[in-house]
Amino acid sequence: MKSKVCDMFGIEFPLMAFTHCRDVVVEVSKAGGMGVLGAAGFSPEQLEIELKWIDEHIEGKPYGVDLIAPTTMANKDESATPEELHAMVPEEHKNFAASILARRNVDTKDIYDGKPTGVGGFLGEKGAANIIDVAFAHPISLIVNALGVPPQYMIDKAKEEGVATGALVGAKHH
């Protein structure tokens, strides 16, 4: 089954598997598709570990990385606290997530009461650039931004490295 996607990436099937599991990335790519590592929330150090493992097992097959890098780089000065980042999440999103958990009988009464930890470093310009640089230090064929249009830094770096870019969107009006 040939397509433009197959020709573009040198894959046998126009199948892309977005996954957080490095094993799945490798197996999909080795089977003729393209595995794409969903690296949202990974620290640069963790992403390096995962990509190094993929490189050692993928037998030269193409793969991609899906990151979170806001186009606006909203937190340019890196000074937002976890509480401020939590406050940026729309109330509708919090309510939607809580409703899903409630339908599954997960207690949600204190879900947002704890102090947020370890989140949001990628939302700043420096954090996003760091994780993007880790991805480009590996032989990736595709880089995708999970938050829509990639920031200019990612686009420029992809052009420089000859890597295709992609954007995920949640609704057709995006």
Predicted regions located by residue number:
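Active-site entrance/lid segments in N-terminal catalytic domains of soluble metabolic enzymes
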Residues: 1-174
